[in-house]
């Protein structure tokens, strides 16, 4: 098993990158979150990896953090979730957001990810309950109810999870739901 790769980033063709390790180029599939975290071409990178061996291919998946790789490994254990769908989930949600959605049993957050329908989201929540949240302490970092309501409102209005989370962080502590939505929308429009 190839657990980690360090080398020079020589190509970015989403969702695949190529890392040169001593003259050998490794094609690695990465979630968009990892792709955005990568430095410019020619820079040195280290990725935590997962190797999938199939009859017709050996595919290397790369992640910026060990937590992301761990989440990927848990996701592909869920029936109906393959590697592509797992990458899609990690592209749409951070590991902490995924753990929080699992802990709070929020299927709505999962169904916003391409390739995840209502039944798949419910199965994912059921099969992953207690597996991911315990690893990163999602229950300790659970968002208060008003913030969850604000986040859900922003997501329903079509803003991405990343944009919505960024707007939430800018809100003053203890902001009510209606005031929070108003302030968040104001911040997002700028």
Swiss-Prot record:
GO cellular component annotations of the record: cytoplasm; Holliday junction helicase complex; Holliday junction resolvase complex
Annotated SUPFAM superfamilies: DNA helicase RuvA subunit, C-terminal domain, Nucleic acid-binding proteins, RuvA domain 2-like
Assembly information from the UniProt record: Homotetramer. Forms an RuvA(8)-RuvB(12)-Holliday junction (HJ) complex. HJ DNA is sandwiched between 2 RuvA tetramers; dsDNA enters through RuvA and exits via RuvB. An RuvB hexamer assembles on each DNA strand where it exits the tetramer. Each RuvB hexamer is contacted by two RuvA subunits (via domain III) on 2 adjacent RuvB subunits; this complex drives branch migration. In the full resolvosome a probable DNA-RuvA(4)-RuvB(12)-RuvC(2) complex forms which resolves the HJ.
The name this protein goes by in its record: Holliday junction branch migration complex subunit RuvA
Keyword Cytoplasm: yes
Domain notes: Has three domains with a flexible linker between the domains II and III and assumes an 'L' shape. Domain III is highly mobile and contacts RuvB.
DNA-binding recorded as keyword: yes
UniProt keywords, alphabetically: Cytoplasm, DNA damage, DNA recombination, DNA repair, DNA-binding
Region (Domain III): 142-190
InterPro entries documented for this protein: DNA_helicase_Holl-junc_RuvA_I, Hlx-hairpin-Hlx_DNA-bd_motif, NA-bd_OB-fold, RuvA, RuvA_2-like, RuvA_C, RuvA_C_sf
Source organism: Bordetella petrii (strain ATCC BAA-461 / DSM 12804 / CCUG 43448)
Family under the similarity heading: Belongs to the RuvA family.
Pfam families the record matches: HHH_5, RuvA_C, RuvA_N
Domain I, as annotated region: 1-64
Segments for region (Flexible linker): 137-141
Residue ranges, annotated region (Domain II): 65-137
A GO BP entry: DNA recombination
Organism superkingdom: Bacteria
HAMAP family: DNA_HJ_migration_RuvA
An MF annotation (GO) of this entry: four-way junction DNA binding
Localization of this protein: Cytoplasm
Function: The RuvA-RuvB-RuvC complex processes Holliday junction (HJ) DNA during genetic recombination and DNA repair, while the RuvA-RuvB complex plays an important role in the rescue of blocked DNA replication forks via replication fork reversal (RFR). RuvA specifically binds to HJ cruciform DNA, conferring on it an open structure. The RuvB hexamer acts as an ATP-dependent pump, pulling dsDNA into and through the RuvAB complex. HJ branch migration allows RuvC to scan DNA until it finds its consensus sequence, where it cleaves and resolves the cruciform DNA.
């Amino acid at each position: 098993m190839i657990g980690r790769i360090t080398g020079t980033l020589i190509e970015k063709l989403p969702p695949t990158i190529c890392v040169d390790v001593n003259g050998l180029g490794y094609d690695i599939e990465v979630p968009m979150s990892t792709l955005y975290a990568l430095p410019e071409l020619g820079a040195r990178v280290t990725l935590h990896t997962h190797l999938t061996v199939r009859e017709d291919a050996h595919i290397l998946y790369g992640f910026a953090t060990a937590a992301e790789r761990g989440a990927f490994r848990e996701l592909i254990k869920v029936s109906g979730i393959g590697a592509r769908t797992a990458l899609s989930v990690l592209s749409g949600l951070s590991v902490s957001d995924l753990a929080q959605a699992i802990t709070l049993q929020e299927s709505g957050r999962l169904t916003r990810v391409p390739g995840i329908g209502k039944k798949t989201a419910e199965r994912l929540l059921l099969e992953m309950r207690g597996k991911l949240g315990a690893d990163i302490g999602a229950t300790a970092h659970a968002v208060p109810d008003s913030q969850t309501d604000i986040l859900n409102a922003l997501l329903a209005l079509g803003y991405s999870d990343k944009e919505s989370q960024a707007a939430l962080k800018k809100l003053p502590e203890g902001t009510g739901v209606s005031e929070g939505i108003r302030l968040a929308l104001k911040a997002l429009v700028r």
